[in-house]
């Protein structure tokens, strides 16, 4: 992968996670319901535009596209090269998801339990949004990555729904394409396809975002097969994408979506397609330029963006319950004051720090987890040895007379 594309993806990951965090923080602590009826400072309008559901949703769509491009694209590359890949693919995907999702579900259980005990008077954990979400069944369902698909999410961690969708894309995509993996026995290929089709149908049956999200994820995967950029200029592709996202943010909302629900889906498809065009522009563009993407902090921030996304909501709800119990629920719902903004931004900072330290015991251990999984699989079924390329014998050269004398001496 070109360095500049890799850096763009890293930047998109942490910026997207930051947008989602801002949206949820604003919803809980900053009430700007009078944004259209009263004058505000310019920065308030900037925040209103930035911390909006529509932008957060576009960030999640970009996550799906990038995941498909990286993970699904790798599957397609292996298929085209007739390479065996299922074993390593399983190791990488299971470790990637469960090393974060498993601890995140436990983290949710612990923090929600403490919050329900300490701040019961706030009533936050009794909101209709969380009614019936603290059962053992939903805890188990979240471990199986079924939240948002066949079951509600566990506790207060609603954002985990998207990770459940991604996990099952990881599982079903290579299975559905296994008939094209000619280096595997035909029986295994057909069995894998049948398993993938069965899983896809079973997961698609309950009403969820799984099927529509699959279109976006697979679009990212198959975009890796496009041999040239659709828009050659990276700036032109970026500006077009940004302009459309701005229009979506301002137009695709409220009454329009209620009256014409299909508009939201069309906007999602358009935004995701344009993001793919941006990826291709960076993939096939020149290596120079875009100095802002060359800083190392993009990778540093991206390395814990997954963890931040996975645990931010329980932290924010815990803080909201604490505020409700100490300052009163009316404080968080009043028209925003400087104190509301100060608290919200402080909480965002605390949540980012928590995400970083959480990642140190989860995401940062991915390499070690993969080695352990590989060792376990090797004990059960050793991986076939890679063929050693034949080497042609090279006749030994006779040393020069002077050299021969020194060797023999």
Label each residue range with its predicted role.
Residues 19, 56, 63-67, 71-72, ...:
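Hydrophobic alpha-helical transmembrane segments of multipass integral membrane proteins
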Residues 1-9, 22-56, 72-86, 149-151, ...:
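Alpha-helical transmembrane segments in multi-pass integral membrane proteins
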Residues 15-24, 96-118, 302-315:
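Hydrophobic alpha-helical membrane-insertion segments
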Residues 12-21, 103, 138, 142, ...:
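Alpha-helical transmembrane segments
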Residues 13, 61, 68, 166, ...:
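Short, conserved phosphate/pyrophosphate- and ester-handling motifs at nucleotide-, phospho-/glycolipid
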Residues 11-14, 25, 55, 167, ...:
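Hydrophobic alpha-helical transmembrane bundles that constitute the permease/transmembrane domains
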Residues 41-49, 87, 97-165, 273-283:
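Membrane-interface helix-loop-helix regions
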């Amino acid at each position: 992968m070109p360095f500049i594309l890799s850096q763009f993806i890293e930047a998109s990951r942490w910026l997207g996670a930051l947008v989602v965090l801002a949206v949820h923080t604003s919803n809980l602590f900053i009430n700007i319901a009078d944004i259209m009826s009263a004058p505000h400072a310019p920065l308030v309008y900037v925040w209103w535009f930035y911390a909006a559901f529509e932008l957060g949703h576009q960030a999640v769509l970009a996550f799906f596209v990038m995941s498909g491009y990286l993970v699904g694209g790798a599957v397609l590359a292996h298929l085209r090269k007739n390479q065996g890949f299922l074993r390593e693919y399983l190791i990488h995907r299971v470790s990637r998801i469960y090393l974060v999702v498993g601890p995140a579900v436990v983290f949710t259980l612990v923090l929600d339990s403490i919050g329900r005990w300490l701040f019961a008077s706030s009533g936050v954990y009794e909101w209709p949004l969380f009614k019936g979400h603290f059962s053992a069944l939903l805890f188990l369902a979240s471990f199986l990555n079924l939240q948002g698909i066949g079951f509600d999410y566990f506790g207060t961690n609603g954002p985990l729904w998207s990770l459940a969708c991604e996990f099952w894309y990881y599982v079903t995509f290579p299975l559905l394409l296994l008939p094209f993996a000619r280096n595997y026995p035909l029986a295994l290929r057909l069995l894998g396809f049948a398993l993938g089709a069965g899983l896809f149908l079973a997961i698609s049956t309950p009403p969820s975002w799984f099927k529509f999200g699959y279109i976006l994820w697979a679009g990212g995967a198959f975009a890796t097969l496009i041999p040239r950029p659709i828009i050659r200029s990276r700036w032109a592709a970026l500006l077009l994408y940004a302009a459309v996202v701005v229009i979506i943010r301002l137009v695709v909302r409220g009454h329009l979506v209620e009256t014409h629900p299909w508009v939201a889906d069309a906007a999602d498809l358009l935004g995701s397609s344009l993001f793919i065009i941006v990826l291709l522009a960076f993939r096939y563009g020149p290596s120079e330029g875009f100095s802002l993407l060359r800083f190392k902090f993009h990778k540093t921030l991206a390395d814990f963006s997954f963890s931040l996304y996975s645990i931010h909501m329980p932290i924010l709800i815990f803080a909201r319950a604490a505020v409700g119990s100490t300052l009163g629920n009316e404080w968080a719902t009043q028209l925003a004051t400087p104190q509301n903004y100060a608290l919200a931004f402080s909480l965002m900072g605390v949540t980012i720090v928590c995400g970083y330290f959480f990642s140190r015991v989860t995401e940062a251990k991915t390499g070690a987890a993969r080695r352990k999984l590989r060792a376990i699989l090797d004990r059960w079924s050793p991986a076939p040895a890679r063929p050693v390329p034949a080497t042609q014998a090279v006749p030994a050269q006779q040393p020069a007379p002077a050299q021969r004398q020194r060797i023999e001496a």
